[in-house]
């Protein structure tokens, strides 16, 4: 059997890959399988990329927020992100520079606590560390100033 491809005679009948029918079948299989393989590889790499690329960043916490998840900047995503996990298992992207978001995350680092024995307010560190979030020294200074003001009013009224 003499196969021809591009007007060149091929004498070996066992080489069927060069026939037009098998080439078109091979091309079809590659075109069908390659996008599926690329899609699977993209899904594996999903956690390493930015999650809030094409979403609107909210400046306040949405209603039904269960927890906040700060995400550090990394090699594949060069910006800091904050995800709000909702009670209905949905997620929303928050603006990490918004005042309301920063206030809620800063509350995780330091607390203003009333010492019952001495009856004074004190700022306590919770010793939580996020790689995505620097320890807010300005918020700690604000809490110390507020505690000092509360202690002053308490002791002034007591005497």
UniProtKB/Swiss-Prot annotation:
GO cellular component term of the entry, any: extracellular region
Disulfide bond sites: 50-77, 52-93
GTP-binding listed as a keyword: no
Entry's Gene Ontology molecular function annotations: chemokine activity
GO terms (BP aspect): defense response; immune response
InterPro entries: Chemokine_IL8-like_dom, CXC_Chemokine_domain, Interleukin_8-like_sf
Keywords: Disulfide bond
Assigned protein family: Belongs to the intercrine alpha (chemokine CxC) family.
Protein name per Swiss-Prot or TrEMBL: Putative viral CXC chemokine 2
Species of the source: Human cytomegalovirus (strain Merlin)
Gene: UL147
């Amino acid at each position: 059997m003499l196969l021809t491809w591009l007007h060149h005679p091929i004498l070996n009948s066992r080489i069927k890959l060069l026939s037009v029918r098998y080439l078109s079948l091979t091309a079809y299989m590659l075109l069908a399988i390659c996008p599926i393989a690329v899609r699977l590889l993209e899904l594996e790499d999903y956690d390493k990329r930015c999650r809030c690329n094409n979403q609107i960043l909210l400046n306040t916490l949405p209603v039904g927020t269960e927890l906040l998840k700060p995400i550090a900047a990394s090699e594949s995503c060069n910006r800091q992100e904050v995800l709000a996990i909702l009670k209905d298992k949905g997620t929303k992207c928050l603006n990490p520079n918004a005042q309301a978001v920063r206030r809620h995350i800063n509350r995780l680092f330091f607390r203003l606590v009333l010492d019952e024995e001495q009856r004074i307010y004190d700022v306590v560190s919770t010793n939580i560390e996020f790689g995505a979030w620097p320890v807010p020294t300005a918020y700690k200074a604000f809490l110390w100033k507020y505690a000092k003001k509360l202690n002053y009013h308490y002791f002034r009224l007591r005497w």
